[in-house]
Amino acid sequence: LYSGKNSSCAIGGIKANIGHTFAASGMASLIKATLCLHHRFIPGVPQWNAPKTELLSGNELYVPVESRPWLIQPGGLKRHAAISGLGQDNVCSHLILSEVPAELRQKVEVAESGDLSLFPLMGQDMSTVRKTLADLENDLQSGKDPAALARKYYEVSKNTDAEFSAVLIGATREEILKEIAAAKSGIENSFSGKGDWSSPKGSYFTASPLSREAKVAFTYPGGFSAYVDCGRSLFQMFPGLHELDQKFLNETGPADKRRGSNYLCELLQERRLFPRTMERLSNKELDALQDDFIHSPIAMFESGVSSAVLNTHVMREGFGLEPQIAFGYSMGEISMLYGLGVWDSMSNMSDILNTSKLFSERLAGPMNAVREAWKLTENEFRNETLWGCYTIRISVSEVQKLVDKEAHVYLILINTP
């Protein structure tokens, strides 16, 4: 079970999560491992920093500092969990669990529980919106359960033709009350023509709604948009995403003789998004990992496209949103086509990316396309930066005057005012 290499097995302990349970620790560990398999989720180890030095030599294990999704790894078909226990009488026990077959698992697209509650507050005008806001405030202050209130206000929102809707979001009673306090002035300012109101938490109101007949558009940004820690809680909130992993394997089969992958964990670049280490990484170390990610264009592109597929699935299957319009830019067109199912096999994309020289030699690495265009010799600019992109915050006309004086400087993108 532990013979894999390259940090293949996560380790943790129940004591770190819930404290010392004494004689009940064995049962608590069994429950934790079972829940990990059921939810396909690896919980983080709180307050972890580093192991004792003698444990650092092995490379089979890692400690998840933050919780993360548990994806099927290359060569595997199911997940396994092991429990080791030592009783007060020094008797050791060891138990290995495996997840149930996919056909026996209950399909759940959206998790029914979570930290955040969402409150849609409807009204025909400013006074009725503010009254609904005050009603929610009174309900919370009287001790009513926030989750039950969220369900109540959601049901009300489905059966009204009110023109305006304020949406509040929060994890605790205190957070929601703070959102209400901020919304009072925000809603009034919006009705006064001072623009839409939004909070850092995600609460929102506009006095200029698009109406119920408005169409939905999906926008796909540049393909190179992934980053370390991207989408960490997505699988936990939307368990149905795990079915995509099985879908890729069933539809494409093993990628034996190809350089591409049909495993979601590899297409998503899981190990880059959620690093596996025995020690807690510093901000400087995380920045270095992100810098390496940015300079690995194939990995970055595969991860960006895969993330777009996951988020599109969430919008369509989790929220029931179907776009009437979709568009992508800066290679986001690729994400759009895969995300909306126009193209099927992402493993074929992976194979092409990993066998083509486009992102390994032509536009990245030695950048031979640039060398040929500029007629550079093989040894020129080997130890210097050959190509760089910069953002300049001055007028287009000023930039163009300077660009015209240079042989190898180009104005390639102009943002709108």
Predicted regions and their residues:
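Flexible, glycine/charged-enriched surface loops at secondary-structure junctions
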Residues: 43-45, 142-152, 192-197, 256-266, ...
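Conserved phosphate/anionic-ligand binding catalytic regions in large, soluble enzymes, centered on
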Residues: 20-37, 82-97, 220-229, 326, ...
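FabD-like malonyl-/acyl-CoA
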Residues: 123, 170, 196-400
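Catalytic-loop motifs flanking and including active-site residues across diverse enzymes
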Residues: 22-29, 93, 128, 303-311, ...
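Flexible catalytic loop/linker elements that gate and position reactive groups at enzyme active sites
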Residues: 55-57, 62, 76-215, 226, ...
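Short beta-strand
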Residues: 157-159, 326-328, 409-415
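Short, intrinsically disordered, charge-balanced linker/junction segments flanking boundaries
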Residues: 54-57, 412-417
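Acyl-CoA/ACP chain-elongation machinery
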Residues: 1-67, 84-86, 110-120, 127, ...
